[in-house]
Regions:
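Basic, nucleic-acid-binding surfaces and adjacent catalytic neighborhoods in DNA/RNA-processing proteins
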Residues: 1-132
Length: 132
């Protein structure tokens, strides 16, 4: 959950390899990690005080991208996307984190192959056709 939020705050793609980060991206990621974790620690302390949370969950309605698949990104309004791998899921904003490009997960992109949308605009156009 927090990794999705940290990467969104740092404006980094969830598939970017750490060995390819520039020095500036490393600093940005470090600050985003500190800021995001500090913010959530404070929020959770305010909610629970000295007690233990009633419900332990990774899905919180006020998160920017985690658990918000297909909902609008609070920063740019683009539809939050996800990558599913085995039992794990990563949520990201294609516009804020990936220059508007959609990332392919193993299951759906293999099924769709050539029909997999390349960017957010292509996906939105297809969704509009389905709705009509």
């Amino acid at each position: 959950a927090y990794s999705d939020e940290i990467l969104h705050c740092a404006r980094l793609s969830p598939v970017k390899q750490t060995k390819t980060l520039s020095e500036n991206e490393e600093r940005t990621l470090f600050r985003a990690t500190q800021n995001t974790l500090t913010m959530w620690i404070q929020r959770l302390r305010q909610e629970t005080g000295t007690g233990f949370p009633e419900k332990v969950t990774a899905f919180r309605k006020d998160m920017a991208v985690h658990g918000r698949y297909r909902l609008p990104c609070p920063e740019c309004g683009a539809s939050v996307q996800r990558i599913v791998y085995a039992q794990n899921e990563a949520n990201y904003c294609p516009r804020c984190q990936n220059d508007g490009k959609l990332l392919a997960d193993r299951s759906l992109s293999r099924l769709l192959k050539k029909n997999w949308p390349k960017n957010l605009e292509e996906l939105e156009m297809r969704n509009q056709r389905v709705v009509k």
